[in-house]
Amino acid sequence: LELPHFLILDEMNLSHVERYFADFLSVMESKEEIPMHSGEIENGVPAKLEIPSNLFIIGTVNIDETTYMFSPKVLDRANTIEFRLTTDNLEKYIGSEIKLDMKLLKAQGTNMSDGFMAMALKETDKNLKPSEADLILFFSELKKSGAEFGYRTASEIGRLMYMLKELGESGDNLLDIAIMQKLLPKLHGSRSKLNTALTTLAKFCVKDAVKDFDGKDEDFRKTYFIPFDKLPTDSLAKIKYKISFEKISRMHKNVMENGFTSYAEA
């Protein structure tokens, strides 16, 4: 159990995750063994399967007409990390004269295994006091859209923020990353359902916006729901949760243009 092992599920949503992964999802919290069959060891297969503490599961996801969306049960038990390709990223890749060599990545992380396992197995007490007020705001608004979170998510947010702090993150970045990975992924719906909700959530990401734009949703949208790189310096400086705000802004643009939006499609 000293070395971490990673199970990579490529394009894991080509089938319903909550169906083929149901047994694993059930034991993630209970730490019980997964029942395989009723007998003893049969053809090398044990009657029960224990999920070791050094096993970590990573899944890649694509969203198109051939894939399935995730249920709340799956999202509640996962951290969702979005990777976006920018124009600048693509220009640098195309213009680079260095050939991509995946062999150079082989065994590059072996010296990190001890520290990785130490952090993964560390028992931490959730400390949400610094972010308590904002978490309650997000909970109240997400509940209106049926995307509220529970005790499990709150506890995992506390653990995530602790780990991020251990890795050098600080200040508003801690909750910003947690909002992006743990709260927004469950948000999806129509224009009538999310127009006001996304505006309110965006206000929570901007200092004093709830007070300054009280009853002035349209003014807020005109001021802040513009391309991120075109925001005035003074407006940009007021955004305390920049990653989450940019995502919410993209989701709002999507719902206004297409009548529907979700975290995965924004």
Predicted regions, residues:
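C-terminal regulatory/interaction module of P-loop NTP-utilizing enzymes
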Residues: 1-266
